[in-house]
Every structure is written in structure tokens, then in C-alpha cells.
UniProtKB/Swiss-Prot annotation:
Active site, renumbered: C149
Gene Ontology MF terms: N-acetyl-gamma-glutamyl-phosphate reductase activity; NAD binding; NADP+ binding
SUPFAM superfamilies: Glyceraldehyde-3-phosphate dehydrogenase-like, C-terminal domain, NAD(P)-binding Rossmann-fold domains
Gene Ontology BP annotations: L-arginine biosynthetic process
Pathway assigned to this chain's UniProt record: Amino-acid biosynthesis; L-arginine biosynthesis; N(2)-acetyl-L-ornithine from L-glutamate: step 3/4
Matches recorded under PROSITE patterns: ARGC (PS01224)
Protein EC: 1.2.1.38
Major enzyme class: oxidoreductase
Protein name as it appears in the record: N-acetyl-gamma-glutamyl-phosphate reductase
Species, as recorded: Aromatoleum aromaticum (strain DSM 19018 / LMG 30748 / EbN1) (Azoarcus sp. (strain EbN1))
Pfam families reported for this sequence: Semialdhyde_dh, Semialdhyde_dhC_1
Coiled-coil positions: none
Family affiliation: Belongs to the NAGSA dehydrogenase family. Type 1 subfamily.
Biological role stated in the UniProt entry: Catalyzes the NADPH-dependent reduction of N-acetyl-5-glutamyl phosphate to yield N-acetyl-L-glutamate 5-semialdehyde.
């Protein structure tokens, strides 16, 4: 059994992580931390876990995280980087669901996240946890940077086209919509029911902090710079991301065949039949990414539709998938969950 600690178990990604680990046959949850709720039974805060998670929240100081095999950080940005060195030196592997280790250029990270990086020397060794791209490096990772929700949907949608070099890399467009759970569990005006319900809006058009992460991933696939326009939107749903991606083909290619061949051995990427339109509810509560690729009117413009659950494949599920790879387990352990419908 893998001895697991979870730092920050009270947010949406935290409880989703606990839901998945509670049914994982090789997971032994030994500590779940919360500074503000130490002493409270986890199932009192999250009744959905009653009978499956019998631990109480503890403070980070009382968690004995150095005795774990792996520690997940389901915390705000800036927390994992403060504890990473101590854990790594103790031989503990670390999976960060926040953004502390995603961007390799520390100066760029500090610009977008507005804080000084506490462990810049560890950034270079962190492995970006997109299994469909970095599976072999994930196996030996000591520090795993779990991708963001928007970056996961966008990169999986563009990956076959960019890897194959069949699109104009100077002008990629990602038009992406997210449910309100992507903003986290904290109280903010824009996610109040009266503000978000019956409403739909774009935001951060001038620049979203996931932009450099997406661009970094696409450039690694392409082996050169890319031009990317990324516009996120907030929709009145709880969970789900729908990415509509646009690129111009630089060569004539059967895009349906390209996607099917690239993802034929990927457990969690489902390439839909030609002409399909994936829906967010078709992946809800699952670790699936469903994609469909179109060439409207047979033109040289390719449109990719990519949907994920932002809390699962966009966060906790992908983190568990990476843990399975890191510990040489079946990649689907704990993740063989059918989407919830309706």
C-alpha cells in the first residue's frame, strides 16, 4: 500500500482527491491537513465520504508527512514550494495540484503569480504531469507538477496537430469555457449564485496565468515557438471545461485518422467519431477527455472540441493517474469511473 498524505483537504480539488483515493485499492490515506479545521472529522465536512474516510483533519505540523511515500498538495499557489525541499530530502515524492512547479522559467512564473518562488532550484527537476505527453519522465519523478484544468483541455486538443507539424503554429486560438468550481471553494462575488447563474462571460482576455503554461507545453511539442490566443469564459455550470480550438492546416491531412492514431492507446482520451460534438456532461466526475475534430466545409481550418471535468482530468484525477505511473501501477486504478448523468 502507498502511504499518502494530503495537504489542503478542504477545497474542491481536495475533496475530489479524497473521493478518488478512498476507492483506490493501493492507497493508504494516513494524513489530511487543514490549519483551520484541525480536529474535525473529514466526513463531518464532507458527508459524501462518510464510511470511506475515517480520518480527522490535522495541522501540517502534526501530520508526519515525512513518513509518507507521496504527498499531494491540494493547496493555493505558493504553499507546496515552501515545503518541497524538506519532503524531497526525506525521500517523499510530491504531487502539486497548484502551479508552483509548472512553469520552468522562474521569472515568468513570478511575473504571472505575483510572488517570489521559494524553491527555484527545484523547478528544473519537476516533471510536468501530462501523461499523454510525459509518461516516461513521470515514472521517475520526485516532484510532479500537475497540469492546470484549462491547460489540460487545450493541450490534449492541440497535441496531435502540433506534434505532427501540420498546422500554422503562429496563430493558434483557444476559446475555452469553465464551470464555477474552477475558481475554487473560496467566497468571491463573481461565483455567488446570484452573480454566476443565468450568466455567461469572458474574463482575463488581456492575459490569464494559464497562458504561459499552455504555451510552454505547446512549444515543447512543436520544438519551436508558437503564437497562441487564449480566452477563458465563466459559465453557469458547476464542473466541466469545453475548449473550442482553432488552427489553420499547413498541409492536407486526414485529421480524424491523425487523432485516432495518436490516442489509440490512451486510456483516458476518447476520440469521438467524425462529426461529433462532445458535451461536458459526458465526462462529469470521470477522468476522461473527449475530443472531436472537424474541418468545416472542408476548408483549411481545423476545429477541435475538447471536454474534461475540471476537477478530475483537470486536477485530482490526473494527479492520481500520475501517482499510478510513478508507483508502477495500472494507470486506471481508482479511476475506472463512469461519468455521471444527468
Amino acid at each position: 500500500m502507498i502511504k499518502i498524505g494530503v495537504v489542503g483537504g478542504t477545497g474542491y480539488t481536495g475533496v475530489e482527491l479524497l473521493r478518488l483515493l478512498a476507492r483506490h485499492p493501493e492507497a493508504n490515506l494516513v494524513a489530511i491537513t487543514s490549519r483551520g479545521d484541525a480536529g474535525m472529522p473529514v466526513c463531518d465536512m464532507f458527508p459524501s465520504l462518510r464510511g470511506r474516510v475515517d480520518l480527522r483533519f490535522v495541522t501540517p505540523q502534526d501530520a508526519a508527512l515525512d513518513r509518507c511515500d507521496v504527498v499531494f498538495f491540494a493547496t493555493p499557489n505558493g504553499i507546496a514550494m515552501q515545503q518541497a525541499r524538506e519532503l524531497v530530502d526525506a525521500g517523499v515524492r510530491l504531487i502539486d495540484l497548484a502551479a508552483d512547479f509548472r512553469i520552468r522559467d522562474v521569472g515568468e512564473w513570478e511575473k504571472w503569480y505575483g510572488m517570489k518562488h521559494a524553491s527555484p532550484e527545484l523547478v528544473a527537476e519537476a516533471v510536468y504531469g501530462l501523461p499523454e505527453r510525459n509518461r516516461e519522465r513521470i515514472r521517475s519523478a520526485r516532484i510532479l507538477a500537475n497540469p492546470g484544468c484549462y491547460p489540460t483541455a487545450v493541450q490534449l486538443g492541440f497535441l496531435p496537430l502540433v506534434e505532427a507539424g501540420v498546422v500554422d503554429l503562429s496563430h493558434l486560438i483557444a476559446d475555452v469555457k469553465s464551470g464555477v468550481s474552477g475558481a475554487g471553494r473560496k467566497a468571491e462575488v463573481h461565483t455567488l449564485f446570484a452573480e454566476a447563474a443565468d450568466n455567461f462571460k469572458a474574463y482575463a482576455v488581456a492575459g490569464h496565468r494559464h497562458l504561459p503554461e499552455i504555451r510552454q507545453g505547446l512549444e515543447a511539442m512543436a520544438g519551436q515557438g508558437v503564437g497562441l490566443t487564449f480566452v477563458p469564459h465563466l459559465t453557469p455550470i458547476i464542473r466541466g471545461i469545453h475548449a473550442t480550438l482553432y488552427a489553420r492546416l499547413s498541409t492536407d491531412v486526414n485529421v480524424q485518422k491523425l487523432f485516432e492514431e495518436r490516442y489509440q492507446n490512451e486510456l483516458f482520451v476518447d476520440v469521438l467519431p467524425a462529426g461529433s460534438h462532445p458535451e461536458t456532461r459526458s465526462v462529469r466526475a470521470s477522468n476522461l477527455c473527449r475530443v472531436a475534430v472537424h474541418r468545416p466545409q472542408g476548408s483549411d481550418v481545423v476545429v477541435v472540441l475538447s471536454v474534461i471535468d475540471n476537477l478530475v482530468k483537470g486536477a485530482a484525477g490526473q494527479a492520481v493517474q500520475c501517482m499510478n505511473i510513478m508507483f508502477e501501477l495500472d494507470e486506471s486504478l481508482g479511476l475506472d469511473i463512469l461519468p455521471v448523468s444527468p
